[in-house]
């Protein structure tokens, strides 16, 4: 019995540990969100555009999340000409397909407001005159990171994710969106 125990202990202790501290999952990269009433959707099976360009949806396959302990939603945006503050939302449509989106329940992951002066207006001379003296410069972009670890049970399999900005400008915004999963550990 002791020899069996020692053999099992030896086999288990010689197995390899795999520790991956994080995994970043890019959803949208340099995605344009703008208003264009005449927009003809050039939808693919993966990305769909709705609301005259103000909503984009993408079907993604999320990684297995059983071994992750934390998840974050990350959004980075900059203006490509829209001069106003706008509300926005990053959301998930679990267990949905494009044919039943109207009936699908959305799950908001991150709500945000686009800040004035980010990106497009950094080097505009007229805007610099309007900038408050206590702000040394406009930022190049803005990033939000939100802990969504409590949603790990639904962050799996094939889902639709969406991004909405309430813009009425045909210049709009450029957005990067992703997930970051932390603390992955397995013993092989």
Residue map of PLM features:
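Intrinsic low-complexity, intrinsically disordered segments enriched in polar/basic residues
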Residues: 8-9, 144
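Sec-dependent signal peptide recognition
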Residues: 1-7
């Amino acid at each position: 019995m002791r020899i069996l125990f020692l053999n099992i202990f030896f086999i288990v202790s010689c197995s390899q540990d795999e520790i991956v501290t994080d995994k970043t999952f890019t959803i949208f990269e340099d995605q344009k969100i703008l208003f264009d009433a005449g927009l003809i959707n050039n939808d693919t099976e993966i990305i769909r555009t709705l609301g005259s360009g103000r909503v984009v949806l993408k079907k993604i396959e999320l990684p297995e999340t059983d071994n992750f302990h934390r998840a974050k939603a990350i959004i980075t945006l900059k203006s490509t000409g829209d001069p106003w503050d706008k509300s926005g939302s990053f959301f998930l449509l679990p267990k949905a397909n494009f044919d039943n989106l109207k009936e699908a329940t959305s799950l908001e992951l991150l709500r945000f407001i686009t800040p004035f002066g980010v990106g497009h207006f950094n080097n505009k001379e007229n805007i610099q005159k309007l900038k408050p003296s206590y702000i040394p410069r406009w930022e190049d972009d803005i990033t939000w990171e939100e802990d969504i670890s409590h949603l790990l049970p639904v962050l799996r399999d094939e889902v639709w994710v969406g991004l909405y900005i309430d813009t009425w400008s045909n210049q709009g915004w450029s957005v990067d969106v992703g997930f970051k999963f932390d603390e992955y550990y397995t013993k092989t």
